[in-house]
Amino acid sequence: MQHFKKNEIKPHLNKYWKIPPDQNASFVAAMEDILEVYARPYNVKFPVVCMDESSVQLIGEVHEPIPAAPGHPVLVDDEYVRKGVASIFMEVEALGGRRKVKITERRTRIDWAHFIKEMLEERYADAEKVVLVMDNLNTHNTASLYTAFPPDEARYLAERLEIHYTPKHGSWLDIAEIELSVLKRQCLAGRIDCIEKMRAEVAAWNTDRNNRQTKVDWQFTTKDARIKLKRLYPKF
């Protein structure tokens, strides 16, 4: 019988991970499609742009933090007050080394559609098509453009998109989700109590990352996937 040391097993703790099932043709088909997109050379007329969105809690202080002193960090009371929720839209052009973050009060079809319109008309006005990588959230489709804009405008915007969806359980394939994690860790780890303050702090982070031209060097290829993720492929 195997014996475990005290505290070695912690059944009250869970770590969640999205695990695709074995021999999943749908997963590997969508995965290889994304990996093919990431393998394309940089083309200013057909930029590859990844997008993701998330919600973040606005948190206020019950008691003012005590400032840092020599030998002592800032002291923050463990009590807090919830101030609502803000939504984050993240757009990343990995090879171009630029991103755009927008903070909104909601994450509806309308909000997504306006984010896409701004992307196409303001940031990529000279591109023939934007190659857009994202997950298949129910708002992430051209129907949202028709919900937000007249048919002629919606069609025009839709025709400037080449959409590629990451597979279910494949969020790690979306570079924007990786960048969103960086944003949360570097900029949103502390308590922020209002959307205006969040917008200001995120804008400063966004500008700094773009000024540094921080690029993403994606190296995982289809060849790698067929070896390292062999169990996900149907067997013959």
Q: Which residues does each predicted region cover?
A:
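RNase H-like polynucleotidyl transferase catalytic core
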Residues: 74-80, 154-175, 191-194
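RNase H-like two-metal-ion nuclease catalytic core shared by retroviral integrases
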Residues: 86, 135-136, 163-184, 196
